Amino acid sequence: MKASLFAVIFGLVVLCACSFAEDQFASPNELLKSMFVESTHELTPEVEGRYCQKWMWTCDAERKCCEDMACELWCKKRLG
């Protein structure tokens, strides 16, 4: 009787531990996926029909930052 009770309790503990571990390993992947999915919306059309770069996008003469951004290797919000 004690062995079967121990087996049931041990099974529940293992099941909970596996579920918790699965959640822990899934969370970073979901975070990365959400970062990349959200980053696809960072480009916004300019008046001329070209796209401007938003915050943390690399910029140069061809890839200009949006109007409220300043280009310093990547686009940063203008202060002031």
From Swiss-Prot:
A cellular component term, taken from the record's GO annotations: extracellular region
Domain commentary: The presence of a 'disulfide through disulfide knot' structurally defines this protein as a knottin.
Proregion residues excised on maturation: 22-50
Protein's recorded name: U4-theraphotoxin-Spl1a
UniProt similarity note: Belongs to the neurotoxin 30 (phrixotoxin) family.
Record PTM Leucine amide, positions in chain: L79
SUPFAM superfamilies: omega toxin-like
Cystine crosslinks: C52-C66, C59-C71, C65-C75
Entry keyword set: Amidation, Disulfide bond, Ion channel impairing toxin, Knottin, Secreted, Signal, Toxin
Organism: Selenotypus plumipes (Australian featherleg tarantula)
UniProt-recorded Gene Ontology molecular function terms: ion channel regulator activity; toxin activity
Principal location listed in the UniProt entry: secreted
First and last residue of the signal peptide: 1-21
Cited function: Probable ion channel inhibitor. Shows insecticidal activity when injected into mealworms.
Source organism superkingdom: Eukaryota
Location(s), subcellular: Secreted
Expressing tissues: Expressed by the venom gland.
